[in-house]
Amino acid sequence: HLMYIFIALSMTKNVTFCFDFGSPYSYLAYNNLNSIREAGGEVTIMPVLLGGIFKATGNQPPATVQKKGEYMFKDINRWSKKLDIPFKMNPYFPILTVPHMRGAVLAQRENILEKYMQVMFEAIWVKAMNLNDQEILTNIAEKSGIDPNQFAEEISSDEIKNKLRENTEFAISKGAFGVPTYYLDDEMFWGIDSVKFLLDDLKK
């Protein structure tokens, strides 16, 4: 039996998924993670700060270039229809996601990250709520099971801040310049449209 377990473990392919709630493509990618799992990928979710990645790489948000921004919104709608994922453009975009992403690190520590991601992504990209409002943010976090007082206290703690910084620096060191970004060992895949190549590699 141990031999079978060893073989199964050695065949597991680890995929690291880096995301930020402020990225609508991260929302689509999160909802599409099952396709990676079904192809044999063991997914490790890594909250990162997109702003930190942009700063380190000199990249700019697509919406800062008018025509690029206009195209991006069309493209997201195409992808949401193709993947059959509900999507509504958030009128409060851009969402400044530092506290949201620190909350994700906290949720990961508390073993409720996927629940937290579900309610947070839904609030931003389906219900189109104003997640720049601290009170709304705290209420959404509470829906995932985080006590509001704990949330407020912990997202200001050095432990949580440092972990998010480490995650972001890891992604940058591996070549990230945006999100969603996936890593299969040292191979990087960026964007929702690269998932098909990731799935091909997983099936090899």
List where the protein language model places each region.
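Structural alpha/beta surface segment adjacent to cysteine/selenocysteine redox centers
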Residues: Y25-K127
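C-terminal cap of thioredoxin/glutaredoxin-like
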Residues: N14-T16, F21-T44, V119-K204
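Short, solvent-exposed beta-strand edge segments and adjacent coil->beta transition regions
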Residues: T12-N14, H100
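Short, surface-exposed alpha-helical recognition segments that flank or form part
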Residues: H1, F21, T64-K67, I155
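Generic detector of short, locally flexible boundary/turn motifs and exposed helical patches
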Residues: S10-T12, G52-K55, K67-E70, S80-K82, ...
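Short, Lys/Arg-enriched N-terminal segments with co-localized hydrophobic residues
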Residues: H1-S10
